[in-house]
Amino acid sequence: MAQAAGLPQASTASGQPYVSKLVLLGSSSVGKTSLALRYMKQDFSNVLPTVGCAFFTKVLDLGSSSLKLEIWDTAGQEKYQSVCHLYFRGANAALLVYDITRKDSFHKAQQWLEDLEKEFQPGEVVVMLVGNKTDLGEEREVTFQEGKEFAESKSLLFMETSAKLNYQVSEIFNTVAQELLQRAGDTGSSRPQEGEAVALNQEPPIRQRQCCAR
């Protein structure tokens, strides 16, 4: 049965940021944790596969409003897939991450989308398809056009990135955050509660059509 995620939640106290939950989904070793660590700590290193789920929090300051982003990094191994579905609950956004050098991971991202579609009503969740590891372009198995066309066919946001080179990592999370705030509506200035504040004073990258149709 589909569950209602609703819009990002705003605190009842005046001036508090919206709170949104974002889940990272994808096969093992596609770079979900690397993307999260690069975004949160500007750090890149070889990491062990995630067991269960890792959790990060960051407050994004847009000047007139702010958003507290709760980032849930889920395990990609098949044996954890049923557990990962538990982390869908209450999600407002999802990154479907694949490795551009592994066609199978692209297909797996499509399966994760099917799982999301079973859990949520259309338009309830902001979804971005993310092709990681553009630094390994010579080993590419999934073309940019393939990713773009699939995203367009499903009304998803789409970007390619490299956690290793820090290419478009911030843009991915910031674009999703801006989409979440747009949906929630700008209700005036907000004050971050906790976490690291990051200014989003740049124009978002060109995006595909609205993800998970409105």
Swiss-Prot record:
- Secretion signal: which residues? none
Name where it's found: Recycling endosome membrane; Melanosome; Cell projection, Dendrite
Q: What keywords is this UniProt entry annotated with?
A: Cell projection, Endosome, GTP-binding, Hydrolase, Lipoprotein, Magnesium, Membrane, Metal-binding, Nucleotide-binding, Phosphoprotein, Prenylation, Protein transport, Transport
How, per the record, is this protein's activity regulated?
A: Regulated by guanine nucleotide exchange factors (GEFs) which promote the exchange of bound GDP for free GTP. Regulated by GTPase activating proteins (GAPs) which increase the GTP hydrolysis activity. Inhibited by GDP dissociation inhibitors (GDIs).
Tissue expression summary? Expressed in kidney, liver, and intestine mainly by epithelial cells. Expressed in hippocampus (at protein level).
- Report if keyword Transport is assigned: yes
Tell me the CDD domains matching this sequence: Rab5_related
Q: What are the boundaries of the region Disordered?
A: 183-204
The biological processes this protein is annotated with in GO are: anterograde dendritic transport; cilium assembly; endocytic recycling; establishment of melanosome localization; filopodium assembly; immunoglobulin transcytosis in epithelial cells mediated by polymeric immunoglobulin receptor; melanosome transport; protein transport
Q: Identify the main location.
A: membrane
Q: The motif Switch 1: which residues?
A: 43-54
Q: What does this protein do?
A: The small GTPases Rab are key regulators of intracellular membrane trafficking, from the formation of transport vesicles to their fusion with membranes. Rabs cycle between an inactive GDP-bound form and an active GTP-bound form that is able to recruit to membranes different set of downstream effectors directly responsible for vesicle formation, movement, tethering and fusion. RAB17 is involved in transcytosis, the directed movement of endocytosed material through the cell and its exocytosis from the plasma membrane at the opposite side.
Q: What is the official name of this protein in its record? A: Ras-related protein Rab-17
Task: Record the organism.
Answer: Mus musculus
